[in-house]
Amino acid sequence: LLEQRKAAIDPLKALLYLALATMLGVPTGAMAEPTAPRILNVGYYEFAPAIYTDAHGTARGELAELTRRVARQAGYGVRFRALPSARLYGALEKGSIDLWPGAQGKPELAAHTLEGQHMLSQINLNLYHRAGTPAPRIPEDLAGKSLILIGGYSYWPNINALLDDPGLDLRVLRTSNHLSALEMLRRNRGDYLLDYQIPVEQARQRLQMEELPYQRLTQVPIHFIVSRHARGAEAIVTGLDAAYETLRDAGEDLSLPSD
C-alpha cells in the first residue's frame, strides 16, 4: 500500500517541480544537450589566396576564416562548397547555397539575393600587359588583339560589353589558372591579360616574374551575399551584420587584404 501511494505521489511532485522551475525561470531542459547550430551552406569559387580549397578539401584563406568567425558569432555553423561561378550563381538563385562571401552588385543576382551592409574587402579587375609595351587606349587599342582570361569567371556588364563588341574583333584565350595565364602573357601567347590583382600578385611571386604594368578597369567590393531563397534569409543577413559589428566593436581585427 505504501509503495502504491509513493507511485501516485511522485508524478504529482514532478508536476509541482516543473511548475516551480517555470515560475523561477530555471531552464527545464538543463539536463538536455544544447541544440546544434544551424549550418549555412557557403558557396565560393577558387580565388587564392583569399579563399581556396586545400589539399584536404577544406576551404582556406583569410576570407574563409572571416566567414567562419562571423557566422560563429551569429550562431551559425558553416559548410563550404567550391563551385564554378555559373553554378554558384545558379545555386544562389535556387537557394541550395545560403551564403556567398563575394562581389556586391552582380546584376544577375539582384532579384535573388540580399547583401550585407559591411564591405569585407575590395579587389581590382585589371588589364595587364608586358613590361616595355605601351599602355593600351581602351577600347580602341584592343581591336584585333588577343586577350587572356581565366575560365569560369564572370564579369560586370561594362566588361562583358567590351569582350562581346564585334567591332573590336578580340581573340579571347581562356586558361584554367593564374599561373598559366601569366606564362601565356610572358611567352607572347596573348597581348593582354584580364585578371584580378590579388591572385595575379600571388602567381607572379611564385613565378618570380617582374611586376607587370596594368590599367584598373573595375574595383569590386566584397560583401556577404545571402540567397533570398534561403530559409530565414533576412534573419541571416541581419545576424551576420550584427555579428560583424560585435566583433569589430570588441576590437577584433577583421581586416582582409585589399588591392
Where are these regions (language model features)?
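Ligand-binding cleft/hinge of the Venus flytrap
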Residues: T67-A74, H118, A143, Y155-T175, ...
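Short helices/loops that flank or line small-molecule/ion binding pockets
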Residues: A86-D98, N177-L194, I198, R206
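Bacterial N-terminal signal peptides
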Residues: L15-V26
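Short loop->beta-strand "edge-of-pocket" segments that line small-molecule binding or catalytic clefts
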Residues: R38-Y52, P139-Y155
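Extracytoplasmic small-molecule ligand-binding "clamshell" domains
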Residues: E33-A111, R174
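Periplasmic-binding protein-like
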Residues: Y44-F47, Q122-N126, R206-Y244
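Extended ligand-binding regions for polar small-molecule ligands
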Residues: G61-Q73, T133-A135, E140-Y153, V226-D259
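Acidic, polar ligand-binding/catalytic clefts
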Residues: R68, F80-D141, Y155, P213-R216
